[in-house]
Amino acid sequence: MIKSVILAAGKGTRMKSDKPKVLHTIFDKTLLGYIIDAVNKTGLADENFVIVGHQAERMEEFLKNNYQNAKPVLQSPQLGTGHAVSMVVPYLKDFKGQVIILNGDLPLIRPETIKEIIEFHNSNGSDLTIMSAIFDNPTGYGRVIKNEQGHVEAIIEEKDTTPEQKAVKEINAGVYVLNWEKINPAFAELKSDNAQGEYYLTDIVKWANKQNMKVKAYILKDNEELFGINCKAQLAEATKMMNRRVINKHLENGVQIVDPETTWISPETEIGADTIIYPYCYINGKNIIGKNCKIGPFAHLRGDVILEDEVKIGNFVEVKKTRMKSHTNACHLSYIGDSEFGSNVNIGAGTITANYNPLTKEKSKTILEDNVKIGSNSVLVAPVTVKEGANVGALSVITKDIPAWALAITRAPLRVLECWVKKHLE
């Protein structure tokens, strides 16, 4: 098994936020979460070390609540990327395996890419492997300098390049795989004699070459994975990139998405073939949508939603933490939360599941069994169960369980006051 080191100590000043950069979200999942999950999905890492610094306590709390195999390691003061990695040296004194180092603001990197760079490292017998990319316009990036045998000799920051080096289009992508036992002594020998007075991680390349070690570069196949996030504009752009990636996957798997430009689907949503997603839908969090469903237009699924086959969620319907069995419809203007619906259930327009008690701050469940019909503009006050086949009349407020095959009506009887308007106009 390998270890990962994820660099996440920075503040992210350009984000203009009180929140650490890596705790900003795409589809309600943090940038840091995407990186940790990508590493975990490879099945190769048994431990992740996350370097924290800015708002360290907040970062530690996030890791404690969400990632049990991620250990926060404090970097204080923050003296550069090389210094950051050196913070894990005491934790890996006897470790003889491999370590992968990644930046915490690369949410688009795929698990497959992480596996590939590790396999590349092993198949080439490298001591140190860096991830690189070929850019037509490499301006602003450090250049990867190789010898005639294709071994990496150095990573040179652009401001320090010669004209010949500046013409190189292969850049440093900021991901490293190293044989820990061989490379970790480098961190004690890094120097801060540069304009920033920092210890650079890139200097381990020169160190390894001085020790006659083998340093290779794995060239990234899809440069989009390298897209880093330093400001809110880049966060928005990364969200678009991820969304397009997700949509393309669903299109390839037989889902019909009428307008990909106005449809947003989280990476953790599963959708069955022949389901149709109409324009202006926002599907967030973890969801499972079956086959031959119809979603939208203007629908919002907020996470933990399971829709079995041939379910319809129509325009201006919001659903969260709900399971609906097959052939159930909620087609118009409804809020459905914390619910379980059977099959062949029909939800009339304007129906609300009142799931939240503001006094106790608790949420309760609404259960509708098979073949239940709910009339328009009804409110189901949870906790409540409507048994099989029961009907609820329009404009009803349901606060008690309804027995099977019953009709429940709570609205006031109709009153007609003849000539009332005419009398008031006289």
Give, region by region, the residue ranges found by the protein language model.
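N-terminal nucleotide-binding beta1-loop-alpha1 segment
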Residues: 1-17
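Hydrophobic targeting segments
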Residues: 2-6, 32, 47-50, 231
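Short aromatic/basic micro-patch
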Residues: 25, 108, 177, 228-229, ...
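Conserved N-terminal catalytic core of the sugar/cofactor nucleotidyltransferase
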Residues: 31-102, 108-112, 116-119
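Conserved donor-nucleotide/metal-binding helix-loop-beta segment in metal-dependent transferases, i.e.
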Residues: 112-139
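Rossmann-like NAD(P)H-binding beta-loop-alpha module
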Residues: 133-164
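Catalytic-core segments of class I nucleotidyltransferases/pyrophosphorylases
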Residues: 153-240
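Structural signal for interior beta-strand "rungs" in well-ordered beta-sheet cores
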Residues: 256-410, 414-415
